[in-house]
Amino acid sequence: MKACFMGLGYIGLPTAIIAAKHGVEIAGVDINAQVVEVTNQGKLHIIELGMEEMLREVLASGHFKAYTEPQVSDAYFMVVPTPFKGDHEPDVSFVESATRMVLPLLKEGDLYVIESTSPVGTTERMASLIFSERPELEGKIYIAYCPERVLPGNVIYELVHNDRVIGGMDEASTRKVMEFYGQFVKGTLHPTNSKTAEMCKLTENSSRDVQIAFANELSFICDKAGINVWELIDLANKHPRVNILQPGCGVGGHCIAVDPYFITAEFPMESRMISTARETNNYKAFWCAEKVRNAMLRFELKRGRKPAVAMMGLAFKPDIDDLRESPAKGITTKVLQSCNNADIMVVEPNVSEHKLFKLTPYKEAYEKADIVVFLVNHREFAGLNYRDDVEVLDFCGTFKK
């Protein structure tokens, strides 16, 4: 079987490589010619431990090659971004564009699968698009929705071992698509329909967002009450039926920070708690930025000079290079905009350069800083010795003080 993966980003490329590793002939497609070029050279354009070696293996074996245009295949997977537009309205234009690209290639017996996080009903809408353009294919191809559920930084393991939800447009589609994923997924494959599978993905990430909002709300309360929130949560979690997550500087990434809007946009009256959680997590970044600005003002009033500030971390979570929807990046931007010529050192050990920020090595920034702001709990920061001689704003629990 030959499979065509539309999109070679943080999910599409690893999934394509894993499938190729298990013997599937893969055509990986991306409209970014530079991504295609470096991928075919065996270089990974994302950070994912162990994945570059695997990419070189599947290129050498002939099971994988990247292209800028879709190739004739037996299965087509839409793994493209689904951002939001306007007032947090879901934008499925990339899914539609990728679908239109493969439309001329579809033939009887082919699989068409959406992995991109999508609003409920997207698979049905794409099926209608396909059949309106290619009516001869109705009832003759297999269409399903199968959401990814992996953690960046642990993708190789999770793509293989995590359970997957397979939501077909009909039972035959579900069975056929389960057969494909069964070639490389060791986790259990759970059959359902496409709308339930779409809602399942949105529910998983919205659930995480609500739980993080509770932790972030505790951080507001503890800050005002003079309580160490990290100690509080650790003690509360000693209860056998309590499992509070860790607070942070907000919620980022292209899943948890985005997916709840796919629910609230379509079901606004029925999703008030989900909406409030989004507001809480968005507010946390503004709260953190204000804390930094206040610390800078106190320093200047006390010392009579501008402080040197180390902003530690830009990624949306630890130990990755993904800055999408990152609250740390937003906080850093706000601090830079109001720094009044203070020395702001921006640190991100997983990124070599950035078009907006001048990056400083983390040890250098930590040693020079008058104020240290921990935004992301990268593994490199764990090896630093706590400094009692400067103000440390720890928004991610690096030292839990």
Language model regions located:
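Structural/interface elements that position substrates and couple domains in central-metabolism enzymes
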Residues: 1-401
